[in-house]
Amino acid sequence: MATVKELKATARPAGGKGAARAERRAGRVPGVIYGDNKPPVTISVDDTELRARILAGRFLTTIFDVELDGQKHRVIPRDFHLDPVRDFPIHVDFLRLGEGALIRVSVPLHLKNAEGAPGVKRGGTVNIVTHTVELEAEAESIPQFIEADVSQLDIGSSLHLSDVVLPKGVKTLSREDLTLVTIVPPSGYAEELKAAAAGPAAGAAAPAAAPAAGAKAPAAGAKAPAAGAKAPAAPAAKKK
C-alpha cells in the first residue's frame, strides 16, 4: 500500500507570470490542485520542502495530503518544472484524488537476486531493457516499485512482464510480452561456444582418418611379389 506524506501549502490568488515570479522571490513554488470534477485551486509550497521531496525520488508516484487552509486534499503529483539553469522547482501540478479513482502511473523496476542468477555467475551482465512500467491502480494501491526476480536467468535468457506478479488491485497498461531484463553474454562467449562445438567434431574425425591411412599399406605391400617375379628372369649361365 502506498505511503501518504504530508505537505503544507498556502492559497494564492490566480495571476499571471508576474505573480508567479513574486512567489518564487519569496522562496515559494507556485502550483495548482485540480481534478475530481472540482474547481482548480492555485497554491504555493515552500521551495526547500518541495525540492527535498523531489530529490528523495519517486515523487510522481507518491501520495500527498496537502494541508490548505485547515483542510487536507489527497493528491498525487502530476508534473513539475525545473529552472533550466539553476535546476530548482518553479511550478508543480497536483491531481486531486477522488475515492476509488483509478490512477495511471509509471513505476520503476527493481531487480531481485541479480547476483545469484546463473548467467551472472558465468560472467554474464544484467541488462535492464525496461526501467519503468505503466500501471493503473487506485491511489492507495500504487506500488513504489515493481520487483523482478532474475534468480533463474541464464546467459541469453529474458524476463518478461508476464513473469512478474503484480500487487493486488494493480493492472499493467503495457504488453504482457514486454521484455524487462536480459542476461548479456561476456566478451568472447560466442567464440568459446564455437570452440567447444568444434572440439568433439575434430575428435570424431581423427579415428575415421586412421583406417584410411592404414588401408594403403596392403596396396604398397602388394607390389613386392611383382618385383620378386622378375628375379627368375635373370640371364642364364652361358654354355661352354
Swiss-Prot record:
GO terms for cellular component: cytosolic large ribosomal subunit. GO terms for molecular function: 5S rRNA binding; structural constituent of ribosome. Residues 1-23, 207-240 are annotated as: Disordered. Keywords: Ribonucleoprotein, Ribosomal protein, RNA-binding, rRNA-binding. GO terms for biological process: translation. Pfam families: Ribosomal_L25p (PF01386), Ribosomal_TL5_C (PF14693). InterPro entries: Rbsml_bL25/Gln-tRNA_synth_N, Ribosomal_bL25/Gln-tRNA_synth, Ribosomal_bL25_b-dom, Ribosomal_bL25_C, Ribosomal_bL25_long, Ribosomal_L25_dom, Ribosomal_uL5_bac-type. CDD domains: Ribosomal_L25_TL5_CTC. The keyword Acyltransferase does not apply. Belongs to the bacterial ribosomal protein bL25 family. CTC subfamily. This is one of the proteins that binds to the 5S RNA in the ribosome where it forms part of the central protuberance. HAMAP family: Ribosomal_bL25_CTC (MF_01334). NCBIfam families: bL25_bact_ctc (TIGR00731), PRK05618.1-2 (NF004128). Part of the 50S ribosomal subunit; part of the 5S rRNA/L5/L18/L25 subcomplex. Contacts the 5S rRNA. Binds to the 5S rRNA independently of L5 and L18. This is Large ribosomal subunit protein bL25. It comes from Rhodopseudomonas palustris (strain BisB18).
